[in-house]
Each structure stands twice: as C-alpha cells, then as structure tokens.
Amino acid sequence: MGFGFTGGAGHFINTQYENYATASDKKEGMIRVSGVVWLTNLDINKRHEDLILYKKYSAAEYPTYDNYDAINVDVTKDIPVDYKGAMGVPITFLDKFNPDQFEIVGLGQGNLYRELTPKGLSQKFVDDYYKAGGTGLIKEDHPILGYYDINGKATIPYMRIIIKNKKL
C-alpha cells in the first residue's frame, strides 16, 4: 500500500506548487499537510486491540443529544465502560476502532445523519444556540447533533461518529 504518515503530517511534491513547507522541510515544490491520518480496514493485529475503558457512566457527565437518542463523549478515552446505548464520539475514535468491541452506527451530521434519523435540530435548540453566542449557519431541522452542556448551554460538537459497545 505504501508508507504511512509520521508525525501527523503528510509531505507531497508538486513542482507546480508554490513552496509553503515549514522551515525544516524546505524543498522545491514541497507541500506539507498537517493533521493527516492513515486508516485502513486491512485485518492487522492493531485493529483487534481492545480500547481499555475505565470510566463509569454518569448522566451528569455525559449529556444526551437533543435530537438523537445517544450520549455525547468528548474524548475517546472517556467512553464509559458500562453504557449499553448509542454514543457520539470524536472522529479521532477511528484511530482506536476495534470492530470486535464497537459497532459504528452512523455519522453525526449531514446526509449520513439522515440515515440514522429524520429528526434534525429543534427550533428551540437553534434559538438557544444563537442566544448563547453560537455561530455558524444552522436552522430548524438541521441534520447535526446538538446537546445542552452541564451549564445548560446549547452546544454543537465537532463531527461525531455514533457507536455502540458490542460487548455489553
């Protein structure tokens, strides 16, 4: 397949492209792209390593979405060990995904979100989001997950993947 990316950055050569590489990577035509990950569905050993879960579910710590029956998990390492339902986890979860341990149910926004549920954001949630200083272009029935944080602030998390723990 080729070589993976080290250090979370990919380097590519394009002689027609202006040099924007970092000072340590100066080379004519070098393009440095940060935040690159290498994902595969090849059946390698790492793909079957269980993610060690240690946190217990607490309704106070894991808010539920306003428009989908799932809890929000802000950090992959904080996936609760004892929660049987659907969970919205960050996209960085894919780096730790074990198909023997978790089922990917769907995506938390856009057209793939509509495959999960026809229910978008409520008008009340949208109003609360903008009152709290939220930005962006959302409206009633927007196909994206939203929740109220522990302070009651309407929040739209960055892209979420909906998962379920297969072992519970």
Segments from the language model and where they lie:
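Class I S-adenosyl-L-methionine-dependent methyltransferase catalytic core
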Residues: 1-168
